[in-house]
A protein has these predicted regions:
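Glycine-rich phosphate-binding loops of nucleotide-dependent enzymes
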Residues: 2-292
């Protein structure tokens, strides 16, 4: 079980390049020709009203969905449409709904995230060969480093289900970092958090950026995202309507209209948005069923 790591790309290097990504569910289009790049050491935000296609776009990036059109590249290589291969390539993510192993310890949850970086085979593990033992110790040391980094080291032996909500969110991030990603995707990392927990999450994300890891964040907390991100892209009914620095995005009339519920020219109606949300939910439940 030898371990491998992925070195961070040099600052400013494009790590994610999504080009013309479109995702259809039957006759409904949830994502429409979206282009987006993320550079190493950069935090990019993705915002939009409910039904905008944000999580569907994330699922296209991580191999949960195969885009109907377009392509997704990581460090210049087109990604295979398989989540475990995407993780192995260097992309990790968290989810809207916490997906921890509730009855495993905090440390064990992080060790699960190391599986794509261990290379020893079945026989080495069964026979407890020296190479396996060495790699296992290296993984434990790395997992403890991540728990120190996220402020959870003192609770390494606690069951994940016994952590406060904000710390469960931190644990999800620690587990994602265990795969040594070059790009971290965070799907609503502050959902359900109080202001103190939100501030702690912000500080943690900045600290991750300092390690040279690129970060793409979906979030409904507009103040949080505008304070956090170098760039912000806005999706409305699957289309990217604007992208730029926070101050540019905040002043854009189309963004204001989308969040205030005022229709602008060419904007799909509420009925279409509701249909897209329903299609996304159905596809998500189907995907979860296939994974079990």
């Amino acid at each position: 079980m030898t371990t491998t790591t992925t070195a961070p790309a040099p600052a400013g290097t494009t790590v994610l390049d999504a080009s013309g990504v479109t995702m259809r569910f039957g006759g409904l289009t949830a994502v429409r020709g979206v282009d987006l790049t993320v550079n190493s050491g950069e935090i990019v935000g993705l915002i939009g009203p409910n039904g905008a296609g944000k999580t569907t776009f994330f699922n296209c990036l991580t191999g949960l969905y195969v885009p109907t059109e377009g392509k997704v590249s990581f460090k210049g290589t087109v990604l295979p449409p398989k989540p475990h291969l995407v993780t192995q390539a260097g992309i990790a993510r968290t989810f809207q709904n916490i997906r921890l192993f509730a009855n495993m310890t905090v440390l064990e949850n992080v060790l699960v995230g190391r599986h794509t970086r261990t290379k020893e085979g079945l026989w080495s593990a069964l026979l407890r060969l020296p190479g396996f033992k060495k790699a296992e110790q290296e993984s434990r040391e790395r997992a403890m480093e991540l728990l120190e980094f996220t402020g959870l080291a003192a609770k390494a032996d606690h069951l994940a289900r016994n952590l406060p909500y904000g710390e469960q969110r931190k644990l999800e991030i620690a587990r994602a970092l265990a795969s040594e990603p070059g790009l971290l995707l965070l799907d609503e990392p502050t959902a359900g958090m109080n202001p103190q927990e939100t501030r702690a999450a912000e500080e943690l994300i900045f600290a991750i950026r300092e390690k040279g890891i690129a970060i793409l964040v979906i979030e409904h907390d507009i103040r949080f995202i505008m304070n956090l991100c170098d760039r912000v892209a806005v999706l409305v009914q699957g289309e990217k309507i604007v992208e730029g620095p926070a101050e540019v995005v905040q002043a854009d009339e189309r963004v204001i209209a989308a969040y205030l519920g005022t229709p602008f020219e060419g904007a799909p109606g509420k009925e279409e948005a509701a249909e897209v949300e329903a299609a996304e939910a159905e596809a998500h439940s189907t995907t979860e069923g296939d994974d079990k």
